[in-house]
């Protein structure tokens, strides 16, 4: 599965390199959502809430009101906030360091995604700004019991469009008893296809926003034509009527 990402800061969709260097900002957030939702779930991340510099909560509520399947992340640090987003229509909530808190067990496990944000092998916190001193590998087992999936982000690769650190990705996917979504450095359809073969999903941002990766190509890359005995799933549409 591909999961396009809308990272929000000051009411705009933004992309940062390595979580700190702004690259672009766009105001057409709702148009992006309408496009991205065609491929399945969309990740909407409140960067301001994650870094403690503000909030895009009102905008996220409006996005959820469209009925699009959205996983919400950024700044969710207590049970009330997590429940509020789920009640507002979020398909899932993405939790960072808060995933270690006891209240997390009161949430529906299948609607919780735990963010494993890593610089190298170290888990980072506070919107990727600080190191925790903990190794990602040591967290997978204990945190897997609290969630339905992990979001593994390679912070050093985020926004760089220089490829994925495959040995680390493969190690995390292999060690995890729950599904893993990978983010950071995913640039080509081949990257998406390789993740699919590993059994992982691809959360994509910078490559899509800059036009380096076409979402249709990324979607098709997940299809294993060999398994279908030459059959290809299709959706047909009348060019004249649009039906």
Question: Where are these predicted regions, by residue range?
Answer:
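C-terminal helical cap(s) of enzyme catalytic domains, especially alpha/beta-barrels
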Residues: 102-114, 192-221
